[in-house]
From Swiss-Prot:
GO MF terms, alphabetically ordered: electron transfer activity; flavin adenine dinucleotide binding; succinate dehydrogenase (quinone) activity
Note: Present with 10400 molecules/cell in log phase SD medium.
Protein name: Succinate dehydrogenase [ubiquinone] flavoprotein subunit, mitochondrial
Modification sites for Tele-8alpha-FAD histidine: H90
Organism: Saccharomyces cerevisiae (strain ATCC 204508 / S288c)
Cofactor(s) the protein requires to work: FAD
UniProt cross-references to SUPFAM superfamilies, sorted A to Z: FAD/NAD(P)-binding domain, Succinate dehydrogenase/fumarate reductase flavoprotein C-terminal domain, Succinate dehydrogenase/fumarate reductase flavoprotein, catalytic domain
Annotated gene: SDH1
Residues where substrate binds: H287, T299, H398, R444
Any single GO CC term annotated in Swiss-Prot or TrEMBL for this entry: respiratory chain complex II (succinate dehydrogenase)
Subunit structure: Component of complex II composed of four subunits: a flavoprotein (FP), an iron-sulfur protein (IP), and a cytochrome b composed of a large and a small subunit. Interacts with EMI5/SDH5; interaction is required for FAD attachment.
Sorted UniProt keywords: Electron transport, FAD, Flavoprotein, Membrane, Mitochondrion, Mitochondrion inner membrane, Oxidoreductase, Transit peptide, Transport, Tricarboxylic acid cycle
Membrane topology: Peripheral membrane protein
Length: 640
């Protein structure tokens, strides 16, 4: 076995002669040479290595891997950068399934799926993107099956589909739809491993445990990304004709969330620092069933299999809030109902501050076959046997509907300063939770997230194939490109203030949890803006204790905090300015949806932490890609 010294020079020598190498006990496959041309930063402190690729994908979750292997399969020299091993990406935690109108359990139609998604979005979703996603869903699932995703099966061998919230037949006029394709309750795990295998098969070049710092831009065009290799301390500049951001959400801006600790909004913050906008950050989804005390997710599939919520009186209270859909109403509806029950004194437990999810009435064989993962999770994190006891649950931050404004074909957007119309950002694309396509609008339907990853990761590859020739030479660029990013890294690595990263991060999380929560008012949101601004200012007083460049977790966590603060601040300001209730944005002082004034996307700009947040707005796309194929869905009252 090869030994690997910690100097960059010995590592580069090793990589010239092998496609696999060892680091500690971990063997990584790079699927190609990762050495490039070497240089030094202007001050001589940092060893810089340059690479040239057709396409660079930042993030190796479901969206990033689907885009990466699609690009590599099409003949593009493709790099995929990830700050952790790909199969540890947060997609692995997705449980319930992936939506598609396959019709395996009953007659179904992708147009019904589209209707449900538009309604679920509370008419903030762009209908051209929703049209594309729901139409492409069935063929995307069949592709996944061919790639090797081991879907659960019906008795006749078809892909098993379960019920999820907000899904109906006949444009909302029919009964509950069974549209969610599942791999028991470990769908994300199966999907992620399958996509990683495909990416390796198609010779994607992986740069694992590289932390993406900033986008490289020149004359308004995104020309690549600069990253920090945590293993040896080198800085890498990746030149690319297309840079694809697939870095996930920023759930860790909140105190209680279902997100992995790595969900820190890195891609969103990079876009913001580059001077481009983010969209609809005020829309943060609270999942109804996070385990009380830990935040671990209990899939909506548990209710889809027949589970139900009860309060301290043993009442199935969702029948009062959503008489038709009951426990399978949309997530924002269920989360608000739980919060109202707790407020009115019907919570359970000593503090009466949570609810119960009842599964014990389900046959043990159903729990074993369909919900093995959550049975284990409930035992470990709640100490309950689901065959005998209810699971204590509480609404928990789960998903960011907002992100990088993106067209249905994956191209990132800004707005033209002169005309106010949409304008494509040259060289930049996005997909997955980091993007705002916007198929989820103000509220995401359960199991549309994995579909989003697959459909729009695939769309990115198709768009690039239609617009870019493989192997084109790169234009000359300034030799000091990325110097601001290196200066920021150096500043944070040597920061000698009085506040730890952990202290500032905790203050941020508690502020967001308290002031930008399930129910919002002008006073709570204004206080949230003041508080998060005060927290941002303390970032200038941050202290890092580790000055090294090798496996410096203190530095990485400080960089992540910088990214989280950028996302948190824009979330609070955007929420304070939207004076209506729509989807996950529930204002007690503005309880109604206001289509006349607020059926529009929020765009927010912030160049750096503690800089002012600027807001503008762009129209919601209320037409489909082809009105003859699929007419748009006009706004109506959203009730379940």
């Amino acid at each position: 076995m090869l030994s690997l010294k910690k100097s960059a020079l010995s590592k580069l020598t090793l990589l010239r002669n092998t496609r696999t190498f060892t680091s500690s006990a971990l063997v990584r496959q790079t699927q190609g040479s990762v050495n490039g041309s070497a240089s030094r930063s202007a001050d001589g402190k940092y060893h810089i290595i340059d690479h040239e690729y057709d396409c660079v994908v930042i993030g190796a979750g479901g969206a990033g891997l689907r885009a990466a292997f699609g690009l590599a399969e099409a003949g593009y020299k493709t790099a995929c950068i990830s700050k952790l091993f790909p199969t540890r990406s947060h997609t692995v935690a997705a449980q319930g399934g992936i939506n598609a109108a396959l019709g395996n359990m009953h007659k179904d139609n992708w147009k019904w799926h589209m209707y449900d998604t538009v309604k679920g979005s509370d008419w903030l979703g762009d209908q051209d993107s929703i049209h594309y996603m729901t139409r492409e869903a069935p063929k995307s699932i069949i592709e996944l099956e061919h790639y090797g995703v081991p879907f659960s099966r019906t008795e006749n061998g078809k892909i098993y589909q379960r019920a999820f919230g907000g899904q109906t037949k006949e444009y909302g006029k029919g009964a509950q739809a069974y549209r969610t394709c599942a791999v028991a309750d470990r769908t994300g795990h199966a999907l992620l491993h399958t996509l990683y295998g495909q990416a390796l098969r198609h010779d994607t070049h992986f740069f694992i445990e590289y932390f993406a710092l900033d986008l490289l831009t020149h004359n308004g065009e995104v020309v690549g990304v600069i990253a920090y290799n945590q293993e040896d301390g080198t800085i890498h500049r990746f030149r690319a004709h297309k840079t694809i951001i697939a870095t996930g959400g920023y759930g860790r801006a909140y105190f209680s969330c279902t997100s992995a600790h790595t969900c820190t909004g890195d891609g969103n913050a990079m876009v913001s620092r580059a001077g481009f906008p983010l969209q609809d950050l005020e829309f943060v989804q609270f999942h109804p069933s996070g385990i009380y005390g830990s935040g671990c997710l209990i899939t909506e599939g548990a209710r889809g299999e027949g589970g139900f919520l009860v309060n301290s009186e043993g009442e199935r209270f969702m029948e009062r809030y959503a008489p038709t859909a009951k426990d399978l109403a949309c997530r924002d509806v269920v989360s608000r109902a739980i919060t109202m029950e707790i407020r009115e004194g019907r919570g359970v437990g000593k503090k009466k501050d949570h609810m119960y999810l009842q599964l014990s009435h389900l046959p043990p064989e159903v729990l074993k076959e369909r919900l093995p993962g959550i049975s284990e999770t409930a035992a470990i994190f709640a100490g309950v046997d689901v065959t005998k006891e209810p699971i204590p649950i509480i609404p928990t931050v789960h998903y960011n509907m907002g992100g990088i404004p993106t067209k249905w074909n994956g191209e990132a957007l800004t707005i033209d300063e002169e005309t106010g119309e949409d304008k494509v950002i040259p060289g930049l694309m996005a997909c997955g939770e980091a993007a705002c396509v916007s198929v989820h609008g103000a509220n995401r339907l359960g199991a549309n997230s994995l579909l989003d990853l697959v459909v729009f990761g695939r769309a990115v590859a198709h768009t690039v194939a239609d617009t870019l020739q493989p192997g084109l030479p790169h234009k000359p660029l300034p030799s000091d490109l990325g110097k601001e990013s290196i200066a920021n890294l150096d500043k944070l690595r040597n920061a000698n203030g009085s506040r730890s990263t952990a202290e500032i991060r905790m203050n941020m999380k508690q502020t967001m949890q308290k002031d930008v929560s399930v129910f919002r008012t002008q006073s709570s949101l204004d206080e949230g803006v003041r508080n998060i601004t005060a927290v941002e200012k303390t970032f200038d007083d941050v202290k890092t204790t580790d000055r090294s460049m090798i496996w410096n977790s203190d530095l990485v966590e400080t960089l992540e905090l910088q990214n989280l603060l950028t996302c948190a601040s824009q979330t609070a300001v955007s929420a304070a300015n939207r004076k209506e209730s729509r989807g996950a944005h529930a204002r007690e002082d503005y309880p109604n949806r206001d289509d006349e004034h607020w059926m529009k996307h929020t765009l927010s700009w912030q160049k750096d932490v503690a800089a002012p947040v600027t807001l503008k707005y762009r129209r919601v796309i209320d037409h489909t890609l082809d009105e003859k194929e699929c007419p748009s869905v006009p706004p109506t009252v959203r009730a379940y």
